[in-house]
Amino acid sequence: MATEHIENKLKLLPDKPGCYLMKDINGNVIYVGKSKNLKNRVRSYFKSKQVGRRAELVREIRDFDIITVSSDKESFLLEITLIKKYQPYYNVQLKQGTGYPYIEITNERDPQTRLTSFVHKDHGYYFGPYPNVYAAQATLKFIQKVWPLRRCSGHQGRPCLYYHMGQCLGACFKEVPKSAYDKQIRKIKRFLNGDISQVKQDLTEKMTQASMNLEFERAAEFRDQLKYIEQTVEKQKIISNDHTQRDIFNFYVDKSWISIQVFFLRQAKLLRRETRLFPLTDTNEPQDAFVSFIAQFYGQRNRVLPKEVLVPAGIDNEALAEVLGVAVRTPQRGQKRALLEMAHDNAKLKLDEKFRLLELGNRKTKGAQKEIFDALGLPYGHRIESFDHSHIQGADPVSALVVFTDGEPDKHEYRKYKLKGEVEHQNAADEVGNTREVVRRRYSRLLKEHKKMPDLILMDGGQIQVDACLDVLRNELNVNIPVAGMVKDDHHRTNHLIFGDPTQGEELKLIPLNPKSEGFYLMTRIQDEVHRFAITFHRRTHAKNALSSKLDEIKGIGPKSRNKLLRKFGSLKKIKEASIEELRDAGLTLPQAQTVKLSL
């Protein structure tokens, strides 16, 4: 529902192209969009029913601004600028950096080759990124052996170790001609761009010559270099007839999600690929999200632009090319078209996979919870609450509540209760008293605060706990929540549910669940979780009470001093280990600190 302020602004919208900026209650830009007609597009957010991520966006909008431009192309360019500036939450967001290394030929008087994770705009040469760090290291090592540049810090006044190994041109002790570097760099670039035939020929000739000169170690080194090329470079599948550095983008949309696939072609080979999945804010214009992704993709710190970008039809190639500064094309036939379709198929495959995994997850969560409700003959409910009690021969009795929503634990909703009733022995009457107290406290509070009740209560126990819970709900609170008990067998293993409502004249019945079903697994998981939560809380409570009792026995230590020690140290062991000075830092006087040390 649009506010009066927004309604008034909607009446003033022009029929022009431009960008709109949606803002939240704090004035922060949470979404940037563009349109050929601002009036129609912006009004659509508030004048029609929204679903999914777009509905979430609309709920947060408290204001908006517009910027008009003269053409759709200008609005696209402006949108990219605004997204970079504001990084809005509801626009496609990309993490910075790729984490993959590049091979760099540095832009220096005495250049060197090295691995780097950072791309600097210094006009150096960058090749990559390489998804396999070890392959990148091996390639760099090969280059440094075959076409050495500078490997030392330079200008040392004496030859470095690498010079003696033939892996440095000698900048360490002499001036190396620029032409010598240029010659090596041309060969390195040719190799990294996929032209390896000449390299293999040169290495074969050197290996043959070394063998003829009886330099067998050197011949073996050339042999290993040839082997590296054959195993690491040549084994990569050639998927293009030219060596143009090319990135291929395509996308697939389903169920308000977009899947984007990126292929990186280097040296006529598919170097690597990336997949990104995002929920769409504007499902009517997925192309906008796709183009925004590409622009942000190359705006990241460690991205090197290729020579060419391929995109599907329906994209404003001219505007995108202006943003990127490289050619953007849509092939109509041939090998490039096939690669573009391959990217689309892979994008679809990834999104289908995501939905299948979600479906499998739902079977284990929401589907499992439905099995429990079906077994009890109840309509599906989203929320299950479960109780368990814990005490040691009646000492420090506590109860714990866990909540499962659609088959998943909702730990923010867990609650712990210190029971106030006096318990002398662990028997049936104690369980009844504990159950009645915690159920009364829990649901009387929900009634008082007008909060939503659960759809099912599962008691960790049998008829005793179920009867006590139902008696409080029906006869004291007048609340109609289904209650079932999780019953264990003689081996303390969950066996079945017990369900019915004696307050309504229904007999409690045993309800079996298939031990191999997801519903049975969820029931045991709930039982284990509430038991764990209750036991953990009881141990802490018991330890704290035992510590308090021990401190109460020390003469001169009253409730205030005891609480100071509990807050500072938390355990009897730590208090014992504390020095006089540390005890005084906790707020005790010197005589009190000395008394504590002597008493413990």
UniProtKB/Swiss-Prot annotation:
An annotated Gene Ontology molecular function: excinuclease ABC activity
Source organism superkingdom: Bacteria
InterPro entries according to UniProt: GIY-YIG_endonuc, GIY-YIG_endonuc_sf, GIY-YIG_UvrC_Cho, RuvA_2-like, UVR_dom, UVR_dom_sf, UvrABC_protein_C, UvrC
GO CC field: cytoplasm; excinuclease repair complex
Alphabetical list of Gene3D superfamilies matching this protein: 5' to 3' exonuclease, C-terminal subdomain, GIY-YIG endonuclease, UVR domain, UvrC, RNAse H endonuclease domain
SMART domains xref list: GIYc
The GIY-YIG domain, residue ranges: 15-92
Primary location recorded for the protein, binned into one broad class: cytoplasm
Keywords from the named record: Cytoplasm, DNA damage, DNA excision, DNA repair, Excision nuclease, SOS response
A Pfam family annotated for this UniProt entry: HHH_5
Keyword DNA damage attributed: yes
Compartments (UniProt record): Cytoplasm
Keyword flag DNA damage: yes
Domain UVR: start-end pairs: 197-232
GO process terms (BP): nucleotide-excision repair; SOS response
PANTHER family: UVRABC SYSTEM PROTEIN C, UVRC/OXIDOREDUCTASE
Assigned protein family: Belongs to the UvrC family.
Subunit note: Interacts with UvrB in an incision complex.
General function of this protein: The UvrABC repair system catalyzes the recognition and processing of DNA lesions. UvrC both incises the 5' and 3' sides of the lesion. The N-terminal half is responsible for the 3' incision and the C-terminal half is responsible for the 5' incision.
Protein's UniProt name: UvrABC system protein C
Species lineage: Bacteria, Bacillati, Bacillota, Bacilli, Lactobacillales
Primary gene name: uvrC
